[in-house]
From Swiss-Prot:
Keywords, sorted A to Z: Heme, Iron, Membrane, Metal-binding, Mitochondrion, Monooxygenase, Oxidoreductase, Transit peptide
InterPro entries linked to this entry: CYP11_CYP27_families (IPR050479), Cyt_P450 (IPR001128), Cyt_P450_CS (IPR017972), Cyt_P450_E_grp-I (IPR002401), Cyt_P450_sf (IPR036396)
Entry superkingdom: Eukaryota
Cofactor(s) recorded in Swiss-Prot or TrEMBL: heme
GO biological process: response to DDT; response to insecticide; vitamin D catabolic process
Disulphide-bridged cysteine pairs: none
Name the UniProt record assigns to this protein: Probable cytochrome P450 12d1 distal, mitochondrial
Subcellular locations according to the entry: Mitochondrion membrane
Transit peptide extent on chain: 1-19
Family, per entry: Belongs to the cytochrome P450 family.
Length: 521
């Protein structure tokens, strides 16, 4: 397999670094000046015995099959809102906190190049197994410090500006039209329920949508070319990577000491996805060159073409990271939205009323203008993210010494921030067990929005290192939910008391044979 050569070095745009650096230095000095001998030492933070903790994950142990939310919540009950998860087998200790003041302290002191460790298996693969491809460009998932800052600055304008998404409105609508036809094909003609494995269909839809952005092509996995071998390889590997990461980097694992079967599977998975993505992008590059040689003027509007202009190597890495970070997480979120709406038909009816005003016919086109007028749609998605948090929280590595819950936490410590768990607590969200999209809208009487701590609602992270794909996911989710609810009344007639589990991210714990009834008008 030929590796795409690097035509140019990564463009470096530092932007308003001086003001950010000044703010970072100020925060550091404030944190440093507030540390006194009265604060407890790091060694006094509550924690389990290292060997008992390791034993809990072994066969027959308390956490053998536990999700990250289950075992961190169990430890929270035992040790309180802050505790240490002991490191082992080459992984350092992690401090875990559920205190919003701690979460704010960590973010306020993260500096201009926030550091997020925790995906060591991917970092090792990129640095030591395939340096021929990655070299100095590790991608946003794996890189740190100045290397991360240079890459993020180079690609921020591509992903974070709304104008970069304009060309995707129509093709994303077409992909969703195809998905609607797929639903009609596979649902039972009598019950109108889709098959038990419908989550696979949802994942194919998400993969198709993200693949459009990542590879400038439709893979055909929804209907047209369901057996496309290259696409299926990318589809399966993108789903496997997160599960393997959980086993290697979150749970205790000896892969840093000996080559375990799980790590060998991870290496094969990463290699397979890399080889296919290189092949696809090489085809794109060759096709683009032919068009240039034919005298065609090329307008680089797509995200992929703009990434290729920076560096073909960056295009390979970002295309992989889009799928790796997006397919399972977004597919699970879509399942959760449909479940919430099916279990709350009054909210579904209210959403459909909004959609009918924007989409008078089922095949009405969605565009940048009319999608601005869908506040209830966005509130539904936002409330779903709160009601079914997609993961435990996020991680940061302290850039300097800080005080967390009265304890001195030294520079270089990795902190697991349990912000997502707080979204289901009445302290921060009144009536937390109710699905209330209205909580995100302005009060019709006062015109005011609900006051929410920014450090309890962080589905896409916070600060300079927040998820770069947020706008892409927002567009995909809004398009899909709008299309589905405009075309169907959705029901779920099964038990949904525990529909999801959180391993590394949230994933389905049950099947979702939704009932899709056509809307007449």
């Amino acid at each position: 397999m030929n590796t795409l050569s690097s035509a140019r070095s990564v463009a470096i745009y530092v932007g308003p670094v001086r003001s950010s650096r000044s703010a970072s230095v100020l925060a550091h000095e404030q944190a440093k000046s507030s540390i006194t001998e009265e604060h407890k030492t790091y060694d006094e933070i509550p924690r389990p015995n290292k060997f008992k903790f390791m034993r809990a994950f072994m066969p027959g142990g308390e956490f053998q099959n536990a999700s990250i939310t289950e075992y961190t919540s169990a430890m929270r009950k035992r040790y309180g809102d802050i505790y240490v998860m002991p490191g082992m087998f080459g992984r350092k200790d992690w401090v875990t906190t559920f205190n919003t003041k701690d979460i704010e302290m960590v973010f306020r002191n993260e500096g201009i190049w926030p550091r997020r460790d925790g995906l060591d298996s991917i970092v090792y693969f990129r640095e030591h197994v395939r340096p021929d491809v990655y070299g100095e460009v590790q991608g946003l998932v794996a890189s740190q410090n100045e290397a991360w800052g240079k890459l993020r600055s180079a690609i921020n304008p591509i992903f974070m500006q709304p104008r970069g998404l304009r060309m995707y409105y129509e093709p994303l609508s077409n992909i969703n039209n195809e998905f609607i036809e797929r639903i009609k094909e596979i649902r039972d003609p009598k019950t109108l329920e889709v098959p038990e494995d419908f989550t696979d269909e949802i994942s194919r839809l998400v993969f198709e949508s993200l693949g459009l952005v990542a590879f400038d092509r439709q893979m055909g996995l929804i209907r047209k070319n369901r057996d496309n071998s290259d696409a299926l390889t990318l589809f399966q590997t993108s789903r496997d990577i997160f599960r393997l990461t959980f086993k290697l980097d979150i749970q205790p694992s000896m892969w840093k000491i000996i080559s375990t079967p799980t790590y060998r599977k991870m290496k094969r998975t990463l290699n397979d996805s890399l080889n296919v993505s290189q092949k696809m992008l090489k085809e794109n590059q060759d096709a683009l060159e032919k068009r240039r040689q034919a005298g065609e003027k090329i307008n680089s509007n797509s995200m992929l073409e703009r990434l290729m202009e920076i560096d073909p190597k960056v295009a390979v890495i970002m295309s992989l990271d889009i799928l790796f970070a997006g397919v399972d997480a977004t597919a699970t979120l879509l399942s959760a939205v449909l479940l919430c709406l099916s279990k709350h038909p009054d909210k579904q009816a209210k959403l459909r009323e909004e959609l009918l005003s924007i989409m008078p016919t089922k095949d009405s086109l969605l565009n940048e203008e009319n999608m601005k007028d869908m506040p209830y749609l966005r509130a539904v998605i936002k409330e779903t993210l709160r009601y079914y948090p997609n993961g435990f929280g996020t991680m940061r590595t302290c850039q300097n010494d800080v005080i967390l819950s009265g304890y001195r936490v030294p520079k270089g410590t990795t902190v697991l921030l349990g912000s997502n768990v707080l979204m289901k607590e009445a302290t921060y969200y009144p009536r937390p067990d109710e699905f209330l999209p209205e909580r995100w809208l302005r009060d019709p009487e006062t015109g005011k929005k609900m006051q929410v701590s920014p450090f309890t609602f962080l589905p896409f992270g916070f600060g300079p290192r927040m998820c770069i794909g947020k706008r892409v996911v927002d567009l995909e989710m809004e398009t899909t939910v709008a299309k589905l609810i405009r075309n169907f009344h959705v029901e779920f007639n099964r038990d949904a008391s525990r529909p999801f589990k959180t391993m590394f991210l949230m994933e389905p714990a049950i099947t979702f044979p939704f009932k899709f009834t056509d809307i007449e008008q």
